Amino acid sequence: MAKIMIPASKQPVYKKLGLLLVAVFTVYVFFHGAQYARGSAPSPKYSTVLSSGSGYKYSKVELPKYTGPREKATFVTLVRNRDLYSLAESIKSVEDRFNSKFNYDWVFLNDEEFTDEFKNVTSALVSGTTKYGVIPKEHWSFPEWIDEEKAAQVRKEMGEKRIIYGDSISYRHMCRFESGFFYRHPLMDDYDWYWRVEPDIKLHCDIDYDVFKFMKDNKKKYAFAISIKEYEATIPTLWETTRKFMEAHPELIHENNMLDFVSDDQGLSYNLCHFWSNFEIAALDLWRSPAYSAYFDYLDREGGFFYERWGDAPVHSIGAALFLDRSEIHHFGDIGYYHVPFHSCPIDTSIRLANKCDCDPSKDFTWHSYSCTTKFYNINKLPKPAGWQNHIG
């Protein structure tokens, strides 16, 4: 296995921890994309209160800019205007913990125009350049081959069964867009790497090294913080469709793939494991590749984004597992991360102290029985931190 290059101060030195209680997580209703699935109305136009009144005039304080070498990378967020302030907290966390040191750009995408308020608040928070884009209508609508009456009946039935976001149109558009179109937006053309950020997330630990440079130097193409199992009722035929694609295009499957992460029986069935895509750092050429492009187009034509409720997380995860060399997938175990309802928190005390983490290791989900990260470590023969068994839950 190739040696991972990382600054010496960040190398894990695992020490045995005492027995810790693990919080049992039962809430599954907040899975990926929750913020964008909610109905919303545009925020009112921004009132220029900061430039009026008793002579007070707002001006952005320009902080010293990082002048060292940087990768062609950006943060990217799909967000509605109404989620501005829950996103602002996410941006502040990312800036404080990481980006204030490196000043990477931030791309914001929406299916409608961003308000002046949204642009003013986010540009004041981001240390890099902010860019705002509207999603093309063809990437946020029913494609011509979809039977909309059939799709509406499916939504009705899934809603009656109380399947998460089963009756949502916007959630389906979001999943389809994140699966196959965000990286095609013209604003993404300037970049080779991205870090996806959503509203209401938090980074628990300082990140003092450039994660994009880390990915490039260590030949990684996809990285995650949390893995979990998908809600099976949302993807009943996703794996059947994937198998048909694999049988039709065996030449596109990487010879050193990670099929054993997503299937326990050599591809006969899907074990529901996926990387939680509300946090992902990846090379854009993974999604731009002929292999993934063919896979997404095949899925899209089958209609499962609308006739079922296929999520972008399992689609991305299966794509990464099939089309990458398994060594190109990385787990960021030193990046403490939170998205309702799960925490990723380093259980190694030395890492938490060195990185000024503010998380409770007893709430770490990484090694929980419902997480798939233990499987990721096992199949790749990676060393696990001391005391990980105490966090199985």
UniProtKB/Swiss-Prot annotation:
Instruction: Give the way it sits in the membrane.
Output: Single-pass type II membrane protein
Instruction: Give a GO biological-process term.
Output: protein O-linked glycosylation
Name-wise, this protein is Alpha-1,2 mannosyltransferase KTR1
Instruction: State any single GO MF term.
Output: alpha-1,2-mannosyltransferase activity
Recorded hits in PANTHER family, A to Z, give: ALPHA-1,2 MANNOSYLTRANSFERASE KTR1
Give the record's keywords alphabetically. Glycoprotein, Glycosyltransferase, Golgi apparatus, Manganese, Membrane, Signal-anchor, Transferase, Transmembrane, Transmembrane helix
Matches recorded under InterPro entries: Glyco_trans_15, Nucleotide-diphossugar_trans
Q: In which pathway does it act?
A: Protein modification; protein glycosylation
This chain's function reads: Mannosyltransferase that transfers a mannose residue from GDP-mannose to a range of acceptors in vitro, forming an alpha-(1->2)-D-mannosyl-D-mannose linkage.
Report whether Glycosyltransferase shows up as a keyword of the record: yes
Where are the bilayer-spanning segments?
A: 17-34
Query: Where do the catalytic residues lie?
Result: 280 (nucleophile)
**Sugar attachment sites:** 120
**Per the entry, which co-factors are needed?**
Mn(2+)
**PTM note:** N-glycosylated.
Q: Where is it found, in Gene Ontology cellular component terms?
A: fungal-type vacuole; fungal-type vacuole membrane; Golgi apparatus; Golgi membrane
Compartments reported by the entry: Golgi apparatus membrane
Q: What else is known?
A: Present with 5480 molecules/cell in log phase SD medium.
- Gene3D superfamilies noted in UniProt: Spore Coat Polysaccharide Biosynthesis Protein SpsA, Chain A (3.90.550.10)
Q: Which organism is it from?
A: Saccharomyces cerevisiae (strain ATCC 204508 / S288c) (Baker's yeast)
The record's similarity note reads: Belongs to the glycosyltransferase 15 family.
List the ranges whose topology is Lumenal.
35-393
Q: Which residues lie on this side of the membrane: Cytoplasmic?
A: 1-16
Please state the protein's primary subcellular location.
Answer: Golgi
Region named Catalytic: 69-393
The main enzyme category here is: transferase
Q: Where is this region: Stem region?
A: 35-68
